[in-house]
Amino acid sequence: MRRELLLEKIETYKAIMPWYVLDYYQSKLAIPYSFTTLYEYLKEYKRFFDWLMDADLTQAPKIADIDLSTLEHLTKKDLEAFVLYLRERPSLNTYSTKEGLSQTTINRTLSALSSLYKYLTEEVENDQGEPYFYRNVMKKVSTKKKKETLASRAENIKQKLFLGDETLAFLDYVDKEYEQKLSNRAKSSFRKNKERDLAIIALLLASGVRLSEAVNLDLKDVNLNMMIIEVIRKGGKRDSVNVAGFAKGYLESYLAVRQRRYKAEKQDLAFFLTEYRGVPNRMDASSIEKMVGKYSEDFKIRVTPHKLRHTLATRLYDATKSQVLVSHQLGHSSTQVTDLYTHIVNDEQKNALDNL
């Protein structure tokens, strides 16, 4: 969603939250957590607080009145009842036949709660320099993770990557072929944003940055002479990221039309812009996800921006066989996360089996 709309929704949630959640929000904003992450966490807290009231685990008449002692004295059994509620509640998605939330969604909810409890029991300080309370019930609640070997995950992901010549073929398809099947009205919209869309896709494929990192790019963060961009990684760390040379032409073409086409002024700092009723705005994550999905589905298979990150990582490992280099490019502090890419490009095992 647009940044302005996102901030409006955040303010709506903040208006109904207890004071300690507002403290938490302010603390995480200073790290900084992205507005998208904080918005998702606030949604999860509302879901949890609504359940506390429905389950009569608090006498508070509204969410803002739920006090700290309620959270402090919740039992493991209470939290397990909440998880059961999430698993069995009717789905609000009219396109889904499932009765409850997916395990991935449940894990996300529990992750948000764990973050809040850790803040309240370890990170925050009251007037005496102590946390608000010490009992962290979330440490007793286990999450169920999807069981899958790295080899299995790699094989599933591989089908959704644009490896080898497909990276440039995808860009070439959007540039030269996609327009041919559009109506005249659709062509007009496509042509307006063509350079920008190609620049975004090229940057994701050439750098492997996260979607949030691309969204938050400002003009000052992009150095096309050096082909380096400055991003804010998870945890608020600033990082310099190298960008593959094939993206340069696409980025330059976008910059050549950015000011005129999106009516950008000096105060419009965002690198990737959208324009609505003559007003330029930072392009948001949801719009980029939809854009990438639209083009990729027409080319081969619908993918997310994160799969473009996987594509870059896999191609880089295939070229260098260096997990350290790949982990640095992706902004990971450990090579453990990059084990996946060794499985995606590891054809030696298959070749050995073929020779049996």
Swiss-Prot record:
Domain Tyr recombinase: 169-354
Pfam families: Phage_int_SAM_1 (PF02899), Phage_integrase (PF00589)
Active site residues per record: R210, K234, H306, R309, H332, Y341
Activity regulation summary: FtsK is required for recombination.
UniProt xrefs under InterPro entries: CB (IPR044068), DNA_brk_join_enz (IPR011010), Integrase-like_cat_sf (IPR013762), Integrase_catalytic (IPR002104), Integrase_recombinase_N (IPR010998), Integrase_SAM-like_N (IPR004107), Recomb_XerS (IPR023670), Tyrosine_recombinase_XerCD (IPR050090)
CDD domains cross-referenced by the UniProt entry: DNA_BRE_C
One function term, GO molecular function aspect: tyrosine-based site-specific recombinase activity
Signal sequence, start to end: none
Keywords: Cell cycle, Cell division, Chromosome partition, Cytoplasm, DNA integration, DNA recombination, DNA-binding
Residues covered by the Core-binding (CB) domain: 16-121
GO cellular-component term (any): cytoplasm
Highest rank taxon of the organism: Bacteria
GO terms (BP aspect): cell division; chromosome segregation; DNA recombination
PANTHER family: PHAGE INTEGRASE-RELATED, TYROSINE RECOMBINASE XERC
Family: Belongs to the 'phage' integrase family. XerS subfamily.
Role summary: Site-specific tyrosine recombinase, which acts by catalyzing the cutting and rejoining of the recombining DNA molecules. Essential to convert dimers of the bacterial chromosome into monomers to permit their segregation at cell division.
Entry-linked NCBIfam families: PRK05084.1
Protein name per the record: Tyrosine recombinase XerS
Organism from which the protein derives: Streptococcus pyogenes serotype M18 (strain MGAS8232)
